[in-house]
Amino acid sequence: MVTGHGTGHHGQSPVRVPLSSGAPLVEATFASRPSQFLVEAQMGGRMVRAHLADRGRLTDLLTPGARLLLASREEIGRKTAFQVVAVYQDGDLVSLDTQLPNRLVAAALSLGALPQFARYSRVQREVQLGPHRIDFRLSEGLDTCLLEVKSVTRLVDGIAVFPDAPTERGGRHLELLINAARNGQRAAVVFIIQRSRGCAFAPDVTVDPAFSRSLREARSVGVEIYAYRCPVDPSGITLGQEVPVFASFAAVPFELRQH
């Protein structure tokens, strides 16, 4: 279950999108996570509360004392004045913005930087399919492709793994792609590794066995699976190198793992 198509830059300027839509960022120190979507952090000698969009467990990343990047969110009606944007782990900046991969892929599609999808001139986002939505529908005349994008932040021995918590929603998205492929429609999923490290990708069967099974089934019926390692810095995320995709962590060659 290995795929490879290259980054498709061909000398072009790198595809980049800003963190948090370009909002000013401030540094803080992680203190606690009282609930799934709430983080408490020390900033300038005071405790602040920040919204966290990532549904994952993030136990490897959100450790006491971890350096965070927060964006100020002063909109009326918000319960928190800040948004968690990213966290440093061993010097590697990891984006925790789950919508950033979609913005990055949208930019890459518009610039033709993903050659496997370059033939489609029309790009629709957040397309309703029955009770569910798919991230992108690409089309060129009657030729269409359904494309789902997933955010990856966790590493195990240098291998990017997904999910970080059981994801029924992710499983439903795979079912949409599986059904499309069975009906003769092109379908693909792109895993965006939101950090500069991660030399390969694999589903984490220990976290969500059902998702891992669905991903194997998707591959078997023709759903295309890609993964890109996308470096993050305080100014943005860059579409980086495509990395190999494996059916499971156990299938990753030992020499690719970092101990």
Curated annotation (Swiss-Prot):
Query: Which superkingdom is the protein from?
Result: Bacteria
Matching entries from Gene3D superfamilies are given as: 2.40.50.580, 3.40.1350.60
Q: Which Pfam families match?
A: SfsA (PF03749), SfsA_N (PF17746)
- Any coiled-coil regions, as ranges: none
List the molecular function annotations (GO) for this entry.
DNA binding
Please give the family membership noted in the entry: Belongs to the SfsA family.
Name the NCBIfam families on file: sfsA
Q: What is this protein called?
A: Sugar fermentation stimulation protein homolog
Task: Specify the species.
Answer: Chloroflexus aurantiacus (strain ATCC 29366 / DSM 635 / J-10-fl)
Gene name in the database record? sfsA
